[in-house]
Amino acid sequence: MNMHLILLSLLCCASSAYADIWGDLSQAAQVAYTAPLNGEYVRQTRTGIDSFEIYRLRDKNTLTERRVAKSKAYEILRERDKISFYAANAQDLKAADTDESNRFPAVLPFFVQYLSESYEASYQGDGRIAGRTCHIVRLTPNDDNRYTQELCLDDTDNLPLSRIYLHNDIIVRADLFAALDRETLPVAAELTPTRGLNYTIERTLNEDFARLGENDTFIQSLPTGFRVAGYEQGTLGGYYLITDGLANITLFVEPVDNAHHQLPNIAKNGVFSTAARQSKKHHFTAIGDLPQDGLKRWLDSVEFAD
């Protein structure tokens, strides 16, 4: 598998890849892993800003979550390892099943930083993107100017930059944090799809993926609390998906003599950090939602059978 495609598919958090992606909660929110969640999340896409209402309830054995697309005519219901898409007609149902935004976890980002502390921002003038007039703001991470991205913000979304949070193309306005309610349990009606959405598709999350790495002996030891959630071998090397339930890290392993080593040239997304390490036989690259220095310490502490 082409390494670019591996990276893209992982960063998009495809719902079929592993079963507990929607179970992750925001480290920044400092809430318990079992906390309920009501509210809204907003993410920037190539065609504008998507917004979803979220109703989420989790206990020790069950996860129920309903997502209502505010600008699109469909809803999504997650119950344990089942994901169901609901729409009023076949066209909207197809859009719901293929929409890239549905591949993102319906929660707040895992690690959030103020833009004013992690980015240099510059106003690029007004523009028109996907039929929408907006203010173009260019954001450049202070630690690496190769990973610049531009945001399309209209008058409603154009808050002072210090009040906008960003992670993996997800924008969460500061005022939305106040609107998110993590204490009140969602009522039954909020966890039930709207009547009249009679077109449905049901998907089963692939839990086998999460078991692939359990018997792998290449990783000898991980930092406390982390586990291998999945592994896949590609044409240029392999990658591990590693998580502690809050942070998600992708660890790429490539042979040192691989003439097609490309990872340093792949642009990271949002405020994902990267760290690298090399042994005599392998080159290791970690991409994750930890602070840059924290990810480097994390990678240095992993023990390999190399």
Model regions and ranges:
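Short, solvent-exposed recognition patches
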Residues: 197-280, 293-294
